[in-house]
Regions:
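Structured, non-catalytic alpha/beta "coupling" segments that mediate domain-domain communication
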Residues: 20-54, 268-294, 384-396, 460-498
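Core structural elements
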Residues: 273-286, 304-316, 334-354, 398, ...
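Residue patterns forming the tRNA-binding/recognition surfaces of aminoacyl-tRNA synthetases
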Residues: 1-110, 181, 223, 229-274, ...
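C-terminal low-complexity, glycine/proline- and small-hydrophobic-enriched intrinsically disordered tails
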Residues: 269, 395-560
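Short, charged, amphipathic alpha-helical segments
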Residues: 334-336, 365, 369, 545-553
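Alpha-helical recognition segments enriched in aromatics with Gly/Pro capping
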Residues: 1, 97-100, 104-259
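Acidic, turn-prone loop/beta-hairpin segments
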Residues: 107, 114-117, 136, 219, ...
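Glycine- and acidic
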Residues: 66-79, 164-179, 231-236, 256-268, ...
């Protein structure tokens, strides 16, 4: 070839040092592909292949999503679906592999192709074509794996026969999948389902009405897991170390729609502790005579603390139910975490202790029945997220027929706004006092008087009713009201009033003042640094979106 090019004067030449024409050589890097397994050069070669008219198949599948018969959750993935489907090319469905569904095509002596559902049908068609029996050779290729997978929603149910299973389970409700196979699998199932499956009137039937696109699980640094990076986490190893419930709850609470999961084993350990908290709350109940009372009616509860927790339980039932129905599983898990850990374990249990140790048997009996009811409802709400532990606790805490998995889902409806306001006020007050003591480095054993400034009649009556609880939980020695805040007192705003803790005799005010001033300066410096960082367009464009969001949140917090 080179000699021919030179002979015809087509070669590009340059002069050498002696003035002779020599070929011009330009050094260029080329992208040479190599096979992953063989390591040899991949050379292009034209071959005969089977293709499907994907554009025709895609049209009804596009219409199904556009018209709302099939919905994506989160909805933004519809754009990815449409981008693929509206720009689709003919689909090469043949593969040169040893495994798979063999292509149903047979060739005659002159290479005429006969496509049929069986070899007998192909032979009959060939005999009609040639006018005599001939020997046929079947195509050795197999169907693309995704072509076979596209038939899954109905081929697994006995299709093409009209089986009872096909009638019952097609169409299905929800497909759960990852975004990376929306085109390869989801779109192909839509195309095949609409092409082959029809209702009694002959109308196409979609294989599912909802496509839930779950998050991609990455490592704790946000990197995609791969063997080459050495960052693959085996779920079975995590289950062995932390338990299946802890892993399941972690994945649920971190699976915000549209965001990937950065899986850190430390987070799983934290949610294992949550499971331990639920177990310990049950154990506390058993130690204090808590047991299921089939006749317990929330509406008949008299104690404010019980009516408060029943109100919070009802809110949680509503929130969790709505979140699950809208596939916001992270919000459902977060609502349960807040209710069970913060309200039941941290506060309800603490507020029940004096009742369990008291002499009022009627109050004790109500508290025991109410706590049993709250725990039972909590097990049911937690069951989709922590099935093993909740099933065990459900069976252990009462004699029951059947499994929790087969039980009724909790129903909301109870509400006592006054009780909720009162106990939530108590929680806010004690939390504020504890926080102030911690920030001021007050010794845990030290007590201080509480002076409420600007308290109205409602607050004053609440102080009187809950004086014992406030003194016990916030390490307060006495409670009084005043018109002005005393000097040297830590101040916490609670509703319309200001809670004051005179700490002059318990801490070094000069040291605390210096510490606070130093913290203010540090916060100002951090705010300025973040402000400059966030005003840098290159940082905004190139940084991890999660990092940018965290910096913005922190900057707003410092400005507030």
């Amino acid at each position: 070839i080179i000699e021919t090019i030179n002979a015809e004067g087509l070669a590009v030449t340059v002069k050498d040092a002696e003035g002779n024409a020599i070929p011009y050589v330009e050094k260029k890097k080329i992208m040479q592909p190599f096979g992953d397994r063989s390591g040899v050069v991949i050379e292009p070669m034209l071959t005969d292949q089977w293709f499907a008219d994907a554009k025709t198949l895609a049209e009804p599948a596009i219409a199904s999503v556009r018209e709302g018969r099939t919905n994506f959750v989160p909805k933004n993935w519809e754009k990815t679906y449409f981008d693929w489907m509206e720009n689709i090319e003919p689909w090469c469905i043949s593969r040169q592999l040893w495994w798979g569904h063999q292509i149903p095509a047979w060739y005659g002596p002159d290479n005429e192709a006969f496509v049929a559902s069986s070899e007998e049908e192909a032979q009959a068609a060939a005999e009609t074509h040639y006018g005599k029996p001939v020997e046929l050779t079947r195509d050795p290729d197999v169907l693309d794996t995704w072509f076979s997978s596209a038939l899954w929603p109905f081929s697994t149910l006995g299709w093409p026969d009209n089986t009872p299973e096909l009638a019952k389970y097609y169409q299905t409700d929800v497909l759960v999948t990852g975004f990376d196979i929306i085109f390869f699998w989801v779109a192909r199932m839509m195309m095949m389902g609409l092409h082959f499956m029809k209702d009694e009137d002959g109308n196409p039937v979609e294989p599912f009405h909802t496509v839930y696109v779950h998050a991609l699980v990455r490592d704790k640094n946000g990197q995609k897991m791969s063997k080459s990076k050495g960052n693959v986490i085996d779920p079975l190893d995590l289950i062995d170390e932390y338990g299946a419930d802890a892993l399941r709850f972690t994945l649920a609470i971190m699976a915000a729609q549209g965001r990937d999961v950065k899986l850190d084993p430390a987070r799983i350990a934290g949610y294992r502790n949550f499971g331990t908290k639920v177990w310990n709350a049950t154990r506390f109940g058993e130690m204090n005579g808590v047991k299921r009372d089939a006749g317990f009616d929330p509406e008949n509860a008299k104690l404010t603390v019980n009516r408060w927790i029943l109100t919070e339980l009802s809110k949680t039932v509503s929130d969790v139910t709505t979140a699950i129905e809208t596939q916001r599983f992270n919000e459902a898990a977060a609502s349960l975490y807040r209710f069970v850990w913060n309200q039941v374990c941290d506060w309800y249990v603490e507020l029940l202790k004096p009742i369990f140790m008291g002499e009022d048997e009627a109050a004790k009996a109500e508290a025991q029945a109410c706590m049993a009811y709250v725990l039972e409802q909590s097990y049911a709400l937690l069951h989709p997220f922590m099935p093993f532990m909740t099933e065990e606790l459900w069976a252990h805490t009462a004699a029951r027929d059947g499994l929790l998995a087969h039980g009724e889902w909790p129903v909301s409806g109870f509400a006592d706004a006054d009780a909720a306001d009162e106990i939530n006020w108590l929680v806010d007050l004690v939390s504020g006092l504890r926080s102030a003591r911690s920030e001021m480095n007050v010794p845990p054993s030290a007590t201080a008087p509480l002076i409420m400034v600007g308290a109205n009649a409602v607050t004053s009556s609440r102080l009187a009713r809950h004086e014992a609880a406030i003194c016990r939980l916030a390490r307060v020695e006495s409670i009084s009201t005043a018109d002005l805040a005393p000097k040297g007192a830590a101040q916490i705003i609670v509703g319309e009033a200001t809670a004051c803790l005179p700490l002059g005799n318990l801490i070094d005010l000069g040291t605390e003042k210096a510490r606070i001033e130093k913290a203010i300066v540090k916060n100002e410096q951090e705010k300025d640094r973040l402000g400059k960082k966030l005003s840098n367009e290159k940082f905004i464009a190139n940084a991890d979106p999660d990092v940018v969001a965290a910096d913005r949140e922190r900057h707003a917090e410092l400005e507030g």
